């Protein structure tokens, strides 16, 4: 139950109607929870990591069916990422993979409780990035530079990643990016979709650069 004041909400007015609406909202929140969805998607079966659930497939998709990674082909398994809800997905990966998981690092938003146990967590600034974003990126960078062709890396991204995974390019400071972001998004209301193309030119990770380390 995610609606913590359900009894209060359904104690007056059209009680039956309110109860139905509360249950619908609760079911919707469960369906959108990264933890719930990842636990449905990720499994370890017969020495393989299997990504599959019918709920994630589009009708007629030519690539339908499970995606499998044979563990004998990999020495280590990592999880990295950044998003406002990244810890829920990362925790699900921890539980689904169990001892198969080597470790990893994710960047989440300031104010969250740290719930991951095996995957490291940095709490950082959103929507305006801060120095903690850089520190989190450095930890991911160190991990990425140690990756070999015998390692399997799962990357979790989502809403907020553009800010949380901020790693300024050479000759640009985090303070400059913070001021730029505040001006564009907080003061001017520029959509994130318009800001992201600019970010690719001033960041060490964006534009696919992280995958090329």
Where are each of the predicted segments found?
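N-terminal loops that bind phosphate or other acidic moieties
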Residues: 1-157, 161-213
């Amino acid at each position: 139950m995610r609606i913590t004041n359900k009894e209060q909400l359904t104690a007056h007015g059209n009680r039956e109607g309110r109860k139905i609406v509360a249950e619908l909202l609760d079911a919707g929140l469960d369906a959108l929870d990264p933890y719930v969805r990842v636990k449905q998607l990720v499994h370890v079966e017969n020495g393989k990591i299997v990504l599959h659930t019918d709920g994630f497939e589009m009708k007629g998709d030519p690539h339908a069916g499970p995606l499998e990674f044979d563990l004998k082909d990999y020495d280590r398994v990592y999880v990295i990422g950044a998003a406002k809800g990244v810890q829920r997905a990362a925790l699900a990966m921890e539980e689904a993979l169990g001892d198969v998981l080597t470790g990893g690092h994710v960047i989440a938003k300031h104010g969250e409780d740290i719930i991951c146990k095996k995957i490291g967590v940095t709490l950082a600034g959103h929507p305006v990035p801060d120095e903690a974003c850089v520190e989190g990126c450095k930890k991911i960078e160190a991990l990425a530079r140690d990756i070999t062709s015998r390692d399997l890396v799962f990357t979790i991204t989502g809403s907020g990643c553009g800010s949380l995974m901020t790693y300024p390019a050479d000759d640009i400071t985090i303070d400059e990016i913070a001021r730029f972001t505040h001006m564009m998004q907080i003061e001017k209301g520029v959509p994130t979709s318009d800001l992201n193309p600019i970010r690719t030119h001033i960041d060490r990770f964006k534009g696919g650069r992280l995958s090329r380390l």
